[in-house]
Amino acid sequence: MKDDVLKRQAHTAIQKKLGYAFRDMSLLRRALTHRSHHAKHNERFEFVGDSILNYTVARMLFDAFPKLTEGELSRLRASLVNEGVLAEMAAEMNVGDGLYLGAGELKSSGFRRPSILADAMEAMFAAVSFDADFNTAEKVVRHLFAERVRRADFQNQAKDGKTALQEALQARRFALPKYRIEEQIGHADDSMFVISCDLGELGFVCRAKGTSRKAAEQEAAKEALKWLEEKLPLKKKKK
């Protein structure tokens, strides 16, 4: 009984942060239900929410940065729409307090797991569209991402770690890096990946962890780039 009251309070607070009040609360509850808790979980909602999120942020960037190319806009969107940003946003909204998790996830602090929080955010965008319509869901995304888009700095954020490393190696005329899965820990839906980044002829290999293969590769690439720029800095051209 006490848990139900706390969940309702959490859901009320989450709606205030979203800037949207649900008419059908079952949709919000579904969006916050992890597969470990119930057969009616949020994974199908994530599928729709991901599309709403990507379209809306893409349109926001398209309007805000009229001079950027398609590739530049894609990289900038990747810096804003990713597990890390969504998990950070969910933490700011205390989404973890409103999640429905199975016993195993509760014991392992799943309410703080970035992948679970990020998935819940996407699922909530879908829930809003089902409760109202696409335009309302788009308004919610715009509300949440407005400040992040306003602060977006293409020069510093647009290039993800792998792209930046690739360009740095090409500028020095070295071969592209090779990424390899060294270890995968945990279950299929909530794994921790250990990825190695091998710079080949340079003789440097580093490892990094992430809640997805993509996230781990990005972290490994950033570590390799840091090493490369320290060991082989490019000479600045004389004016």
From Swiss-Prot:
**Class of this enzyme:** hydrolase
Q: Which InterPro entries match?
A: dsRBD_dom, RNase_III, RNase_III_dom, RNase_III_sf
Q: What biological-process GO terms show up in the record?
A: mRNA processing; regulation of gene expression; rRNA processing; tRNA processing
Give residues annotated as binding Mg(2+).
46, 119, 122
Catalyses: Endonucleolytic cleavage to 5'-phosphomonoester
Q: List the disulfide bonds.
A: none
- What is the annotated localization of this protein? Cytoplasm
Residue ranges of the RNase III domain? 11-133
Q: What is its EC number?
A: 3.1.26.3
Which is one Gene Ontology cellular component term of this protein?
A: cytoplasm
Its main subcellular localisation, reduced to a broad class, is cytoplasm
| Classification via SMART domains | DSRM, RIBOc
Q: What does the record give as cofactor? A: Mg(2+)
GO molecular function annotations of the record: double-stranded RNA binding; metal ion binding; ribonuclease III activity; rRNA binding
**What keywords is this UniProt entry annotated with?**
Cytoplasm, Endonuclease, Hydrolase, Magnesium, Metal-binding, mRNA processing, Nuclease, RNA-binding, rRNA processing, rRNA-binding, tRNA processing
Residues at the active site: 50, 122
Occurrences of domain DRBM (ranges): 160-230
Which NCBIfam families does the entry link to?
Answer: RNaseIII
Assembly, in brief, is: Homodimer.
> Which family, according to UniProt?
Belongs to the ribonuclease III family.
Role: Digests double-stranded RNA. Involved in the processing of primary rRNA transcript to yield the immediate precursors to the large and small rRNAs (23S and 16S). Processes some mRNAs, and tRNAs when they are encoded in the rRNA operon. Processes pre-crRNA and tracrRNA of type II CRISPR loci if present in the organism.
Protein name according to UniProt: Ribonuclease 3
Q: Which organism is it from?
A: Neisseria gonorrhoeae (strain ATCC 700825 / FA 1090)
